[in-house]
């Protein structure tokens, strides 16, 4: 029979928790650190793991060493996922920044992903407003506002009317 979780060493409990978290989806290192340091719900309510900073560092190092944690892979998958959901580069940059990913890593991954953002913006506009896209000023402003909210750059938005004019 396994020993109760309260008697297991903090490192083993942290490692078990990290693997369970990373089994669900990829996380950035900062996200994993935040989740590991948060209290976990036990049978008697929230439980803290009495772990040292060294325990956290060892767990993070183990996850990197065994390829459970890889910020580069996380960034590529995140960009692919968010672009499939119709979000533009500005929004993706901002979300990755919130997840602790450096701007340089994000820019490198964005260059490698080969996504045509103006085509994506056009697809999102057509999905929301239909074909043909509005041509009067007030309706164009609505489309622009929608696409800016979704994270597309103004250059990509303006390309819609230049490249896809009927």
UniProtKB/Swiss-Prot annotation:
Keyword line: Cytoplasm
Domain of life per record: Bacteria
HAMAP family from the UniProt entry: RecX
GO cellular component, as recorded: cytoplasm
Lineage: Bacteria, Pseudomonadati, Pseudomonadota, Gammaproteobacteria, Enterobacterales
PANTHER family, per the entry: REGULATORY PROTEIN RECX FAMILY PROTEIN (PTHR33602:SF1)
Family matches, as Gene3D superfamilies: Winged helix-like DNA-binding domain superfamily/Winged helix DNA-binding domain (1.10.10.10)
Family named by the database record: Belongs to the RecX family.
Protein name: Regulatory protein RecX
Keyword Cytoplasm assigned: yes
Pfam family, any one: RecX_HTH3
Biological source species: Salmonella paratyphi C (strain RKS4594)
Subcellular location: Cytoplasm
Annotated NCBIfam families: PRK00117.1-1
GO BP annotations, alphabetical order: regulation of DNA repair
Purpose: Modulates RecA activity.
Keyword Cytoplasm applies: yes
């Amino acid at each position: 029979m396994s020993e109760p979780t309260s008697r297991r060493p903090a490192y083993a409990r942290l490692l078990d928790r990290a693997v369970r978290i990373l089994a669900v989806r990829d996380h950035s290192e900062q996200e994993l650190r935040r989740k590991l340091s948060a209290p976990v719900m036990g049978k008697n309510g929230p439980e803290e793991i009495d772990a040292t900073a060294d325990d956290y560092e060892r767990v993070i190092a183990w996850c990197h060493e065994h390829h459970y944690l890889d910020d580069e892979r996380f960034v590529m998958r995140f960009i692919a996922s968010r672009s499939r959901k119709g979000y533009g580069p500005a929004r993706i940059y901002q979300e990755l920044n919130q997840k602790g990913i450096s701007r340089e890593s994000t820019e490198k991954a964005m260059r490698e992903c080969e996504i045509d953002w103006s085509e994506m913006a056009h697809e999102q506009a057509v999905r929301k407003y239909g074909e043909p896209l509005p041509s009067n000023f007030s309706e164009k402003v609505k489309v622009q506002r929608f696409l800016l909210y979704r994270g597309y750059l103004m250059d990509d938005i303006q390309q819609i009317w230049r490249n896809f004019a009927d």
